[in-house]
Amino acid sequence: MAQIIDENAKVCETLEGYLDSIGITTAGLNYHTLSIIGPQSSGKSTLLNNLFHTTFETMNDQIGRQQTTKGIHAAFNNQNVLIFDIEGSDSRERGDADALFERKAALFGLALSEVVMVNMWEKDIGRYNASSIPLLRTVFEVNLQLFSSSQEAKCHLLFVIRDSTHPGEIIENQVRRDLDMIWKDVILPQNLQGKKFDDFFVFHFFQLPHLKLEPEKFKEQAAKLASMFTNKDEPGFFFAQPMGKLIPGDGLAQYIHSVWDAISENRELNLPSQRKTLSNFRCEEFANQAYKEFETNATEQIVSKIDAKPFTEFKEIGQKLFETAIHNYNQQANKYVRDIANEKRQSLQERISSFLAPSFQRNCTIFKESAEKKFTEYIEKLPTELEESNEWEQNANKKLEETIKSIDEFVKSTMIPEFKWQFDVSDIEDNLHTLITNKLDTAISEMEQRVFERRNIEYKERINAILDSAEPNMWERLRSEMRNEITQTTSEINNILKKNTVDRHPSPKIANMYYRSTDSQITSASQFIQQKMIIRFEEKFLQDEEHKSRVWKPDDDISAIFESARENGLHILNMFTNSQLREPGTPVPLNDILTRQILTQIRREQILTEFNDTIEKSYISAVQIRESLIVRNTVPLWMWIVIAIGGYQQLVSVVEHPWKTLFLLAAIGLVYWLWSNQKLDKVIKVVKNYITRVLCIIVKLLQSTTQEMEVAPSILQASKKSAANDMELIKKGLDDKKIEDEKTLETADTLDTMTTEVSESNSTSASTNSPSKSEDSKEPAPAPKPRHRKRVSTSNNPYATLQPNRINQAELLKMKEMIQKRQAEKH
């Protein structure tokens, strides 16, 4: 037994020690409370000692009636019942202050007790003070103050009727009549109007005989009453239903302090608030204690273990430490207000989560970096030559999925279920996908370059062939070739991409690569446009339709052929002026290489001038050859008459002699044989050549000297002028004019020879007509002095058979006009 509230209304300092000594602090909620009120010297302490075998101080009969219990005392029996013995009311010692302390004591008893015993003598029922009517009035008012708004169980009021001799029903009715009278005088709040006192209290009545007059009966009834507090199987067991007033034993001392402080300061006593305050304080202490223990263990067993390698036992150890901390907290906090305990438990869980979260993130990051490193090594080992591989991107994506899955599984295996942690793997997924994309882009780019370079070798050869031929449809052929090559290259690349990628297509730069390649070949070919023009001119001018060397005939229109060949050469120049690689009808962007200017106007004029200068020589040579043929084939009619008259005797001789006829028939047979074997033309050509030479010699001897003298200077002058031009071209060092220069030189030599022969012929004619010489002289003329000239090959020289003769004056004038016209165009 110990005093907890002294007579000065102060909480005793020994309260905590006493509660700890009787085991309340470790009892949790496994105890019950009751208090007793009543008038002073009414035997309250004696009753408690008899009921619960306590040792409360009782009144000494030898000293007389006086105040025995001062303040509030407490005792604890073996049945875990904490009993409060409250100072009696209506005491002489307190006098007028009795009402104030009486109210405070009533508040305390109702606040802490599950059952409030009212000690009442039967003989005092019906009296005002003796029957504790003022005290009961205080109990009613205090109860309304404390519990009117709460949903706690009703307060149990046990009226113990001492020294009872009347039937219980009569006593109960009398007490209830007094209670009803008291309740009518209590001012009820607005929300409690119409309520009865039975709505707030559970009334119990128990009668005890006189202690001294009937001690055996008293002990018997006292034991029965005591069993109703201690025996759970006893009918009418007072603590059968929890009343919500119990405070966990470890917080009882603090609760008593807070309640009594509020009572002493006359503050409104809000028991639910007091319990919440106590619960908040105690649960906070429990949470701090559990967290401190957890922090120590987690630092040693988890935080220190996470280093360069993933800690695979994170979840197992973390879960165990977390559950231990929560279990330790629950063991102590669950005895307090549930909402407060749950709130503090949640707070503790959040603190534990916050402590472990950095370690969780770090552990997952270490695993993520390890997985990322392995994935990078895998990607680096993939082949870069897509031509030799299959399903490149599919394999990379599969590896990516496996990597992300392994990270997710590790995160799940590490995460504690109670904690809503998040580990973002989207960044690594983006990074690894970017790595795949970059690696694949590089591999595709290199593959496209390899395919292009391989195909471009043959492509350039085909393009060069088209550019070299320079046909009129050159640009159409170039566009077609470029379009087909782009299509084929794109198709080949697309087949490779289908094997190695999911949804990749050839790059648009493939077309640009072929654009640049084609344009480069065109640029290179444009450096030789003049040569192409000359070759095209010579193909049309120096070759016939069968692409054989042209043999000029007297009736050939050289001017028309020349102009046609020249137009063919100029067509090449026109084709190479601007690029026409872009498809007709398509939009033309700025700075388009497919439609760019290839030749500037200055370069074009330069090429045109040099081209005209070069082809003029071919024209002059052709005209000279034609004129020589006219001279060869022009035999006068009178010459044929002379031959017929001179050969008459030979014809008669052939007729008169049969063997000559046979020879003639043999000759005819030979001719037929040659004709049937397609050799006649060749023989005729050879024979005709020899006959022509013979006839030319005869004609040369018979032509007029005057005409020959007029023609010779003109031929000589033209030959010298041509030779001078040839020498000028030779001095310029133009290699591409070498063949033409040789032809011109041969022409000059031929013309010079013709001039010399004409002069010799004139000399012979003059000597024949000279009067100093006899026409019948048989002495042969002296042979002319041989000329030391360069021998000209006749195999490829069309002028080798040219013989000196008279050239038509009109043709020479036409040649002169054409030369002057070319010179005017040049300037």
Curated annotation (Swiss-Prot):
User: What are the boundaries of the region Disordered?
Assistant: 745-827
Residues assigned to the Cytoplasmic compartment are: 1-634, 680-827
- Biological processes annotated in GO: endoplasmic reticulum membrane fusion
- Would you tell me the Gene Ontology cellular component terms? endoplasmic reticulum; endoplasmic reticulum membrane
**Matching PROSITE patterns:** G_GB1_RHD3
Q: Give the species this sequence originates from.
A: Trichomonas vaginalis (strain ATCC PRA-98 / G3)
State the EC number(s).
Answer: 3.6.5.-
Under what name is this protein listed?
Answer: Protein SEY1 homolog 3
